[in-house]
Curated annotation (Swiss-Prot):
<comment type="pathway">
    <text>Cofactor biosynthesis; thiamine diphosphate biosynthesis.</text>
</comment>
<dbReference type="GO" id="GO:0002937">
    <property type="term" value="P:tRNA 4-thiouridine biosynthesis"/>
</dbReference>
<dbReference type="GO" id="GO:0052837">
    <property type="term" value="P:thiazole biosynthetic process"/>
</dbReference>
<keyword id="KW-0784">Thiamine biosynthesis</keyword>
<keyword id="KW-0820">tRNA-binding</keyword>
<dbReference type="GO" id="GO:0004810">
    <property type="term" value="F:CCA tRNA nucleotidyltransferase activity"/>
</dbReference>
<keyword id="KW-0808">Transferase</keyword>
<feature type="domain" description="THUMP">
    <location>
        <begin position="57"/>
        <end position="165"/>
    </location>
</feature>
<dbReference type="InterPro" id="IPR003720">
    <property type="entry name" value="tRNA_STrfase"/>
</dbReference>
<keyword id="KW-0547">Nucleotide-binding</keyword>
<dbReference type="GO" id="GO:0009229">
    <property type="term" value="P:thiamine diphosphate biosynthetic process"/>
</dbReference>
<protein>
    <recommendedName>
        <fullName>Probable tRNA sulfurtransferase</fullName>
        <ecNumber>2.8.1.4</ecNumber>
    </recommendedName>
</protein>
<dbReference type="InterPro" id="IPR004114">
    <property type="entry name" value="THUMP_dom"/>
</dbReference>
<keyword id="KW-0694">RNA-binding</keyword>
<feature type="binding site">
    <location>
        <position position="267"/>
    </location>
    <ligand>
        <name>ATP</name>
    </ligand>
</feature>
<dbReference type="GO" id="GO:0009228">
    <property type="term" value="P:thiamine biosynthetic process"/>
</dbReference>
<keyword id="KW-0067">ATP-binding</keyword>
Amino acid sequence: MILDYDVILARYGEVAIKGPSVRRRFEGKLLHNIKSAFSCRAELRHGRIFIFPEDMDEALDRLSKIFGIVSFSPAVTAETGFDSIEDSLREYIHELRSEGLLTSRTPFAIRCRRVGEHDFTSQEMAAFAGSVVVGEIGAPVDLGNPDLEIHLEIREDETYIYHRVIPGPGGLPAGTQGKVVALLSGGIDSPVATYLMMKRGCQVVAVHMDNAPFTGEEAEEKVEKIAAKLAEYSAGVEFKLRTFSYGRYLESCRRGAPEKMTCVLCKFGMYHLAEMVAEEEGALAIVDGSSLGQVASQTLPNILATRMGVNIPILSPLIGMDKVEIENLAKRIGTYDISVIPDGGCSAVPAHPSTASPPEAVMEASEKINVKEEVAEIFRKGSKTRIFS
């Protein structure tokens, strides 16, 4: 027999410590995002979000991808009172036993949380509930290190019984911190950087550079799949992918500048194009997947050189992370398996790229190939745009 859950209790973290006006705004946005993710009724009660979904399985899957939620629990509802709680708890623990989660040898604990006025204390109800479990199953009580915790969340007229506490992604509700332009490739790093800024409440306009003929169609297909995966974390907020034809600019870099500077000038142009997109989209910052020292364009000298002349913040949330940390996060959020699909790479990458391009040399090369005009022309021609919502 499967537990017949009728409600989900969702908890939020950072939102709760904001000032009253900010908290109300964030709570309202979180409710909106939940209702946008799946069909449900959702309401705030005493620091919890109570969710009544039409499809419980769908709701549990989608809640794990809604930023602002730190954990959630599917629960069954009982009337508040010893007799009603006893009846519901007996049924609940027998279903736990039928699922193999509770036996006569399973150390367990009752965790009771109470809100409102009642004629009993939390400790009294926990002791009573524990005696019900012992009487029915014969399981041993272990408050210090139980294998199973059964929770009673008691409100004025209703009590919620649950044993699962499922982690949420945490962070801030999507759409509460403004808009950013994220440079998105088919690699491992930039999707993770984009995810981390989404986790901090940012709405994302993803910008991808189509480097054809130096890259193949496989690279573009990967980016579409990565964007779709990231959009799963953007319930309630539009996720936009804009793809620009960038190959002509790369060809100009290879023709008009030292070959070893190709990667630096490529990144230099990306930032300037992203700044134009940010102005058009009303975004306040650029995001990229730079991790210090990982590739030629991400050494400190080259980070300095590639960002010259850009007048809005460039945020690099991965800057202090190593490759293993980034890969582990990519696996957790579901982008890793897409990113590692072979796509042929970029044939414009030189055999020996510069790792320390002097800023004055980069500026001289950028003026020689007229980067600003090249990039402006790419921007004027527009982008292929796809919206995920």
